[in-house]
């Protein structure tokens, strides 16, 4: 039996980009969350422990590790603070990939997810970098989402929709914002 770290990164990419319809990427489905937890829970734990370092030798392997940390965390731990716990790890991997120009070896569809940790960050400096990355990518819809994320961080310095889950007290302005359409992703 292979260990989680021996699982080939291609299985992650095949699942995310071939098995799943793109409409499932940004939705919320208990069935998908359960599937990801069942199929990839062990690999997720290996990623959290830093055991997938061998994947980083190839741009696609690094992307797979980012998807596991950034996207699968949100599925496996939906409605839990743990959904965001690996964001820092995923961001560092994405920053290293971009510094090494590894993103140039990925398809546009793959680059969307390589850049996603930037969009998920609560740092305005990182959000500014996110805008540059998504603008250069040239996919208008993704750029609009990056801009919406940026604008929330520019206004509040954090994502108000995470406050309750993370035990943070919301300001009056944040509470009013949370009543607006499009205040959560």
Locations of the language-model features?
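Intrinsically disordered, low-complexity activation-like regions
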Residues: 1-63, 68-79, 83-185
């Amino acid at each position: 039996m292979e260990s989680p770290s021996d699982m080939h990164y291609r299985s992650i990419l095949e699942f995310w980009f071939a098995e799943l319809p793109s409409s499932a990427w940004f939705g919320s489905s208990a069935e998908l969350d359960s599937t990801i937890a069942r199929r990839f829970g062990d690999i997720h734990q290996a990623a959290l422990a830093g055991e997938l370092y061998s994947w980083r030798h190839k741009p696609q392997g690094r992307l797979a590790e980012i998807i596991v940390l950034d996207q699968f965390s949100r599925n496996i731990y939906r409605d839990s603070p743990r959904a965001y716990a690996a964001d820092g790890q995923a961001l560092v991997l994405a920053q290293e990939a971009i510094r090494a120009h590894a993103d140039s070896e990925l398809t546009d569809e793959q680059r969307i997810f390589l850049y996603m940790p930037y969009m998920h960050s609560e740092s305005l400096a990182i959000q500014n970098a996110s805008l540059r990355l998504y603008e250069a990518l040239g996919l208008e819809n993704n750029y609009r989402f990056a801009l919406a994320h940026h604008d929330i961080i520019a206004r509040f310095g954090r994502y108000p929709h995470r406050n309750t889950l993370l035990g943070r007290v919301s300001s009056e302005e944040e509470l009013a914002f949370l009543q607006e359409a499009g205040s959560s992703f």
